[in-house]
Amino acid sequence: MFRISASSSIVALVAFLLAAMMINHGLVDSDLPVGPGLTLDESFNIDQGVYLVDALGQHGPLLFTSSVARDVFGSDRYLPDHPPLGRVLLGMSHQLTSWLIPGSESTAYNVPAARLGSCLAFAITTLLIAEFARRRYGSATGICAAVMLIGMPHVIGHARLAALESVTNLAWVAAMLPLLTWWTNVKPPTTRQAILSGCLWGVLLLTKVQGIFLPVIVVMWSTWQFRWRAIRPLAFYGIAGALVFVAGWPWLWLDPENNILRYLGRTTKRPTLYCWYFGQRYADSAVPWHFPFVMLLISLPAWTLTGILLRLTKKAFDPVERLLVLCVVFPLIVFAVPGVPVYDGTRLFLIVMPSLAVLAGRGFTLWMSPKDFAAAFALAVVSERPAWQKALVWTTITIAPLHWIMQPLAISQYGPLTAGNRGAAWLGMEAGYWSDALNSRFWQQVPEDSAVLVAPVSHQFQLNDIEALVPIVQHRRIKLVAWEYDESRQHGLLLLIHRLADLRPELATIPQDIDVLAEATQNGVIYARLIKIQSTTRFQQQPN
């Protein structure tokens, strides 16, 4: 029953290797290809992950006792902004694999080692998607769905970061598959199946707050599918999930009511983040309602869009596909509600990508094998596609994505609906949210022993984290200082990070007489730029 096919294992291994090849954030004299630079949240995730893994190693099961939980999770050292499970995986990866990746001996943490945790989560997600699709629809769909997932630049881009998104995607898929398997039949799931489904939902809640979407989806689906017979499985589902969630996060025990509200974002006063959308700056809770739909569509690659369109041409959707559609649409609707914060491009709703991968894979295989579609829905028999057409499609969907995913800035890649990154820039979309362009290739252009002013600075620890965690910055003895936007008092080398939502408009384009010493660009789009300013330099003020 739990035997994994060779094809699913192979595509999962390929997913891991393609992601792991580009985890080099700034190593010195490394054989690893250049990857994305250190991004904004990685330092927090690694630090907290190592802290939790060390605590687990020190206390073992006693970590889940009241006194030890208070010492560990009540400490000022602990940061409860996210549930612990995703960070534990990153911390375990760091502790277990640091010895494999040399070059970070002088830094506080080995960032590439922690990034391997995301690569592993991505590979397991690919395995689950491939195996489920294979068992449900056949080997061709399983492989094609996996290829669709691997070929999504934003998905594999996040898999190269010590971020929570890849682990969240894994937990989301793990919690979604029992629903697709047991909750799409004519009869409702058994009590055992409902409890297991609920436990996996609890694991998802322990990974990231997006887990709160799933029970709403389950209630809507079950009510429509089973009517009054949904009451029993829903009750067991909810109880099991809640128990796993509370039992797995001892921080909740310290002050249950207030801490659960903090988890849900009801009591936490967090700083406002900003989006750059069609040439305008929006606060995260004031973005137009269509932001999630537009960002998703313009971020999807051509092969995914084509697969989805092919599936839409076949009018009949089976129950599994209908539930997959619901798992895509509902999170997008939530983030479209006025006042709900949304930022960082597709990051917050990246959980919809695995479902889209299955639907796109299904679209391609139904197009290549019309007889399968006809048999599945009792339609008239149609002729099979010629072998050369199938071979051409398989070659295209496996080879074409490589150019787009095997690049350091895959996480900032736009799709064909904007004609790529250049077209997205012309439309007024954000260049990059994560400062991932500050990688080895960029830092090698910065003079040694230099003091560099930086703008904008996204949080108070950003520059210290770069100095502490990026080996090439230490090796070249580069000192980073926040620029206070006063040319007469602070002048010299100035690093402009093109996060357009935070970069002052007058700094996005510079006067022609200013020297550009280093630049990170792709397809004509600027992501970061090092210039030299004098005390007499003045930038023309523009409205933001």
Where are these regions (language model features)?
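Short acidic/glycine- and proline-prone juxtamembrane loop motifs at membrane-interface regions
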Residues: T39, H154-T168
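Transmembrane-embedded, aromatic-rich helix segments that form part
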Residues: L196, Q210-W224, W303-I308, A360, ...
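Membrane-interface transmembrane helices that cradle and orient dolichyl/undecaprenyl
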Residues: R136, A140, A175-L196
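Transmembrane signal-anchor helices characteristic of membrane glycosylation enzymes that use polyprenol
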Residues: S5-E42, V50, G57-H59, V68-V72, ...
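Catalytic lumenal/periplasmic loop and adjoining terminal transmembrane helix
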Residues: M22-P36, G86, P250-W253, N259-T267, ...
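Transmembrane-lumen/periplasm boundary regions of multi-pass, lipid-linked membrane glycan transferases
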Residues: N45-Q58, H82, V88, V203, ...
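Short helix- or helix-capping micro-motifs
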Residues: A145-I150, G157, L177, W201, ...
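Transmembrane-helix motifs of polytopic, lipid-linked glycan transferases
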Residues: P112, L116-Y137, A174, P178
